[in-house]
Amino acid sequence: MGYAITLRLDAAAATVVEAMWQALASRGVSDEALQLRYPPHLTLAILADSADPQLLVAAARQCAAQWPKLPSIFASLGLFRGTPSTIFLAPIVTSELLGRHAALVSLLAGEPVDPYYAVGQFVPHVTLASDLADSAAAVAALGLSPLPITSLLDRLDVVRFRPVEVLESHSLANI
C-alpha cells in the first residue's frame, strides 16, 4: 500500500477517459484502470506507505485552499517504455501545472515521495493502462480516441491504495 495526491478530471473529460479504459478492456489489453474503481486523475505525488497521512492531508488542504480549477488539454498518448510498459494520456505541460506540483512537493519535504514525482523528474500524465506486455495492442485499441481532450482539473484528493480509499477530497474553486 501507499499514498497518492491527485488532481481529478472534470466529469465530461472523465467520461472520455473512461471510454478509453473500456476500449482497452474490451480488446483484452487491460482492465486495470476499471478495476481501480477510482475516477480518471493526474497524480501529483506517490508516497510510500511509511508517509504520514496527517501531513499529506494537511498539505492537500493548504493547496486546495489556494488553487482554483486548472484548465488542461490532453493532446497526445505517451508510453513509458519497458517490460512491462505503461500507456498514458499526456497533457500540454504548463507552468501552472508544474508550479502546483512543485508547491505540493515542497510541502511534503521529508516524506517518502517516489523519485519519479520529484521536482525536475515529474512527467504529468493520466494512466490508461500499465503492466502492458504488448504496448502495440494498447496503441491500436486507442487509435481512434478523440484527442485532444479539454478538461478542468477540479478536485484534489488524498488516496491510499490498493485498493483505493479516498482519505480526503477537495473541490477546487472556480476560475
Model-found features: residue ranges?
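Charge-rich, low-complexity N-terminal segments
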Residues: 84-85, 92-95
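Short beta-strand element of the conserved SAM-dependent methyltransferase core
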Residues: 7, 89-92, 158
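Short proline/glycine- and acidic-rich turn/helix-capping motifs at secondary-structure junctions
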Residues: 75-84, 119-122, 156-166
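Basic, often amphipathic N-terminal segments
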Residues: 1-71, 95-152, 168-175
